[in-house]
């Protein structure tokens, strides 16, 4: 387990800023202590410094996971967010999409959000902006990328994709072996 390099930090923060903007600083400097990001086996973990100090007593080969996995770096050095980061991203999300109850199950099975399943969308959402997807009861379901801007969503046909799926809470069941 090691700190992220300058390039890795830049790549990860660029990805996070698509979803939570400048609220990234609220993840690190929290009122309940200082938190940090650490890299272990190409995965980025988010943990308090107290847990980090305790984890240094464990050998690197024996350490499976520590803290919350925020995502992983691919072989091409791109950062991919994991669904385990949803609980930390949802409160700070700048742009949100609410899906109708009928479209929730489709999204949780890994499908994109169609215009017919769109309940609400945050004003001034740009095209290809990172969004957090909520149910109509304000329960975070996952995150994705807006396929259309807010203005385009108003006049598009009902079968058009408005949010590209990236991750959802259904992945806990579908990919339980690979989520650590």
UniProtKB/Swiss-Prot annotation:
Which protein family is it in?
Belongs to the NIP7 family.
PANTHER family referenced in this protein's UniProt entry, alphabetically: CYCLIN-DEPENDENT KINASES REGULATORY SUBUNIT/60S RIBOSOME SUBUNIT BIOGENESIS PROTEIN NIP7 (PTHR23415)
The UniProt keyword set, sorted, is: Nucleus, Ribosome biogenesis, RNA-binding
Q: Which ranges does the record mark as transmembrane?
A: none
- GO terms for biological process, alphabetical: ribosome assembly
Region named N-terminal domain: 1-92
Cellular component, GO, one term? nucleolus
Which cell locations does it reside in? Nucleus, Nucleolus
The cysteines joined by S-S bonds are none
| Top-level taxonomic group | Eukaryota
State how it assembles: Monomer. Interacts with pre-ribosome complex. May bind to RNA. Interacts with NOL8. Interacts with FTSJ3.
Instruction: Output the InterPro entries linked to this UniProt entry.
Output: NIP7_N (IPR040598), Nip7_N_euk (IPR055359), PUA (IPR002478), PUA-like_sf (IPR015947), PUA_sf (IPR036974), Ribosomal_synth_fac_NIP7 (IPR016686), UPF0113_PUA (IPR005155)
What lineage does UniProt assign to this protein's organism? Eukaryota, Metazoa, Chordata, Craniata, Vertebrata
| Function of the molecule | Required for proper 34S pre-rRNA processing and 60S ribosome subunit assembly.
- Residue ranges, annotated region (C-terminal domain): 93-180
Enumerate the GO terms in the molecular function aspect.
RNA binding
Main site of residence? Answer: nucleus
The record, for SUPFAM superfamilies, names: Pre-PUA domain, PUA domain-like
UniProt xrefs under Gene3D superfamilies: 3.10.450.220, PUA domain
The PUA domain sits at 94-170
Protein name from the UniProt record: 60S ribosome subunit biogenesis protein NIP7 homolog
């Amino acid at each position: 387990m090691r700190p992220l390099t300058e390039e890795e930090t830049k790549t990860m923060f660029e990805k996070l800023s698509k979803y939570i903007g400048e609220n990234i600083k609220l993840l690190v400097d929290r009122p309940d202590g200082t938190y940090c990001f650490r890299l272990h086996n190409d995965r980025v973990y988010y943990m308090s410094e107290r847990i980090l100090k305790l984890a240094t007593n464990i050998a690197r080969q024996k350490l499976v996971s520590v803290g919350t996995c925020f995502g992983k770096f691919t072989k091409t050095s791109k950062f991919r967010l994991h669904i385990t980061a949803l609980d930390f991203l949802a409160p700070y999300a700048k742009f949100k999409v609410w899906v109708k109850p009928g479209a929730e199950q489709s999204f949780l099975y890994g499908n994109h959000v169609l215009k017919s399943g769109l309940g609400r969308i945050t004003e001034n959402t740009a095209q290809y902006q990172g969004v957090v997807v909520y149910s109509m009861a304000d329960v975070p379901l996952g995150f994705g990328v807006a396929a259309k801007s807010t203005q385009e969503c108003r006049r598009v046909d009902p079968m058009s994709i408005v949010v590209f799926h990236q991750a959802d809470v259904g992945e806990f069941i579908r990919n339980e072996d690979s989520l650590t």
